[in-house]
Amino acid sequence: FTVYAIKGGNLMIGFLIMASIWVALGMIGGVSTWEDAQVKVFQGGPESWGSTAVIVIFGSWFGQVLIKTGVASTLIRKTVELGGDKPLITTILLCLVTGLIFTSTFGAGAVVAIGVIILPILLSLGVPKPLAVSSYLMSVGSGMYVNIVLFKQMQGLFEGFKYDNNYLKFGFAAMAVQLLVVFIMIGVRLKKTNVNHSWAATAGKVSSDEQAPWYALITPLIPVVLAIVFKWQPIPAFIVASFYALFVTGKIKSFKECEKIITKTFYDGVVDVASLLGFLFILPMFNKVS
């Protein structure tokens, strides 16, 4: 299995095959029966991740709402404007904002959609392609230390851990360290590069139709604040934050329009994490039988 994984094999299929082989070996050795395998492995495994899967879906939906309402693109544009004509400061601010966005946002679609905006700006600031991609992904990863959606996934593997102040002290400290590494990487590289200022034109690609009002820019922080300060559960926090973004950006002008955008963003959110959900349902089969 290790060789299969190193060669780039599909881990979801690999875990399913391994779980099936181990079940067969257990039955041959008389350790378990087919009835036990059905209930505890093939049925009980995926069911044990049901609550986590739902949180993943709502987190991905929230990410789609941030994109469709223009909150993410506007936040990035304002960050570039704040940096002014200082490329290093602009780059650092972009990485910081990316980390903050992904403290609550989840889903591959959100990573791609926001990356499409940020990466061209980083490249125009003189950041080499490998460093631009690495810096962006590390900034995304820094936010994941306190992202409750990812925490719930890990909680399924390591039971007993709580999303409380003890964990958050570590989470925010780890986030700060990772962002600091990104800042150092970029700072050292930009000092060796002749920077051009074509980033202004790149930043201008965010059209006025996509701009969200300033009070909508707090949306990425709402789920985090509700979870940490007010001890809310993640799903209600995502729902409140999503409707706040839809309302203040004027996306809810009628009931039909509300139905349309919620259905569309929810659909896109589920599609974004479909392969992840498949993996999350197969993995516990392997865990149970092992």
Question: What residue spans do the PLM features occupy?
Answer:
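Juxtamembrane membrane-interface segments at transmembrane alpha-helix termini
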Residues: 24-37, 122-129, 145-150, 248-260
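Alpha-helical transmembrane segments in multi-pass membrane proteins
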Residues: 14, 18, 22, 26, ...
